[in-house]
From Swiss-Prot:
Protein name per its UniProtKB record: DNA-dependent metalloprotease WSS1 homolog
Location relative to the cell: Nucleus
InterPro entries xref list: WLM_dom (IPR013536), WSS1-like_metalloprotease (IPR053000)
Annotated positions binding Zn(2+): H96, H100, H106
Length: 262
């Protein structure tokens, strides 16, 4: 994402950074920016992109969550007692969520790739890297002394194992939108009304049908009797009179004056 005259943004691979509104908003926002800055080389190397990096409140279910493969990554920055979580731990959770962009389920491939990301992070720690530009130092980072103890033993530091703390799982899962199921198109209400209207049925007068068919038996479609019956019915329909008049066989208009078109 191209940003013009935006020196405050720490990571061009992340579109937006949002902290919870309240008394700790500025501190949380700065914390998230430090996380984003630290992850920039790794995200650039592996082609990761995140639309929005958001802070979420403490909960007993997860420390981080990935929505729709990087559309939004949520991180918990404070524990149940409102204490700030160590930078290493939050960074490790962020790598975990970034890995979900590449692989959804927690399988062997996922943890193998996560180990690669963690190794890259350890290499950055060894170089003293903290971020690009003004984020290269923590002189202006208010929480530096609170969250910046590298290799914190009590929180397991950076390891190649799945991290947990206070019995809370690291990840809340990789969540994706459900695909919309296309339903078969249904007729409009107007068309349905048209289909349900009762029309005038043809051939309801059994006396006329018997006279035309010359037999109560139903004729075959391709039989001579069926063809003659269809011709007789056509002649009857073009008759201007509403009442049926028996045919005058002496009249010039007879079946012999017509032929069947195959």
């Amino acid at each position: 994402m191209l940003r013009i005259n935006d020196d405050d943004h720490p990571n061009e691979k992340i579109g937006f950074i949002s902290a919870i509104k309240g008394d700790f908003h500025d501190l949380s926002s700065d914390y998230l920016k430090r996380i984003a800055a630290m992850a920039f080389p790794i995200m650039k190397e592996h082609g990761f992109g995140v639309t929005s990096l958001d802070e979420v409140a403490y909960n007993a279910k997860f420390w981080g969550r990935n929505w729709n493969k990087g559309e939004c990554i949520e991180l918990v920055l404070r524990d149940a007692s409102n204490r700030w979580l160590p930078f290493e731990f939050v960074m490790d959770v962020f790598l975990h969520e970034l890995c979900h962009i590449w692989q959804g389920p927690h399988d062997r491939r996922f943890f193998s790739h996560l180990s690669t990301l963690r190794a890259a992070l350890i290499a950055l720690y060894a170089k003293g890297y903290k971020g690009p530009g003004k984020y290269m130092t923590w002189d202006s980072f208010v929480l530096a002394n609170v969250v910046g103890n590298y290799n914190t033993v009590v929180f397991n530091g950076i390891t190649l194992e799945r991290s947990t703390m206070h019995g809370v799982e690291t990840c809340g899962g990789s969540l994706q939108r459900k695909k919309k199921i296309r339903r078969k198109p249904t007729p409009s209400s107007t068309k349905k009304r048209k289909l349900t209207r009762t029309g005038q049925k043809l051939g309801t007068d059994m006396n006329i049908r018997l006279e035309l068919l010359k037999s109560p038996a139903k004729p075959q479609a391709q039989s001579m009797r069926g063809r003659e019956a269809r011709i007789a019915a056509a002649l009857l329909r073009v008759d201007n009179s509403n009442e049926y008049k028996p045919k005058d066989h002496n009249s010039s208009t007879t079946l012999e004056n017509y032929f069947v078109v195959e």
